[in-house]
Amino acid sequence: MAEQEVKLMKGNEALAHAAIRCGCDGYFGYPITPQTEVIETLSELKPWETTVMVVLQAESEVASINMLYGGGGTGKRVMTSSSSPGVSLMQEGISYMAGAEVPGLIVDVQRGGPGLGTIQPSQSDYFQATRGGGNGDYYILVLAPNSVQEMADFVDLSFELAFKYRIPAMILSDGVIGQMMEKVVLPPFKPRRTNEEIIKECPWASTGCKGRKPVVITSLELKPEIMEQRNLQLQKKYRKIRENEVRYETKFMDDAEYMIVAFGSAARIAEKTIELARAEGIKVGLFRPITLWPFPEKEIAEAAKKLKGILVAEINAGMMIEDVRLAVNGTVRCEHYGRLGGIVPEPEEMVKALKEKFL
């Protein structure tokens, strides 16, 4: 098998290649536009013949997430992918995984809604992803790629963080990033962990190995005092993640008087917006949250101290802007610009919005 390779491919395809290369043990998914290339690519590559990775098309998204729950519970690196309405069907299983502290990777290549909506791109799953879309007090790790390269890179990173903290992780992409083609440097092959390594690294896992003590993985606890302590332990873990795993990127901020906050494909559009605005003498910079949870609230608050205004650009009706406003706590004016229904905003539109709202 080849080591590191440079390819031209879609974001969805890059993610599939990266999954095989980073030692993923199993994929369970169901086709839905605009992420179907993930399962198609995995099926074409036949990793079960090389790395022994399992690839299974489940009968539904509900089945997929419960297969993920079971696979993650054995200490295996397992993943699923879907798009917005499909991920909605997974919310019960994600809540169960969070409650039982089972790691796993969920990929959401967003499309417009609500309901079945459209097959065009959107970023309207932000609340569902960052607030815990199922029942109970929980969070999951959420990474937002803005390039084909990051679609590949975030697979291994998501698995590393998921197992480090025993938490489900999500790559929150969108139809633009999933379908666009770019050069990508695929990572070298990482060997799959042996059962012996899993037993050593994951003492909580239910492996079924001979001579091992039984392990019960569950989110159920009928005694309220014990359940409260379990919840308090989860909150302690979430605080640790907030302290250590915030990721973000800034550009053109040295002399910025205004700042655009955007993630995913909206951040790519914002970069061109900034180029156009600066050509007109408007000093504007970019703040791109890479982790949507944990959210870089302290970093945004610090950046806001020297600003005259913040424009939050999203492909939705206004979701991340709530987190930005909480972060700056009224110290600077925050306004939103977004498009709905699967329409992707143009850079010229963002420049116009920036002028209308602040200048």
Which positions does each model-derived feature cover?
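Glycine-/acidic-rich phosphate or pyrophosphate-binding loops and their flanking alpha/beta elements
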Residues: 8-14, 235-258, 271
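Structural signature of the thiamine diphosphate
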Residues: 140-196, 349-359
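Thiamine diphosphate
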Residues: 37-131, 141-163
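N-terminal glycine-rich anion-binding loops that anchor highly charged ligand groups
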Residues: 7-44
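Redox- and metal-dependent alpha/beta enzyme cores, enriched for Fe-S-associated oxidoreductases
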Residues: 248-283, 287, 293-299
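Peripheral docking tails and interdomain loops at the edges
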Residues: 314-359
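Conformationally flexible catalytic loops at phosphate/diphosphate-handling active centers
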Residues: 166-250
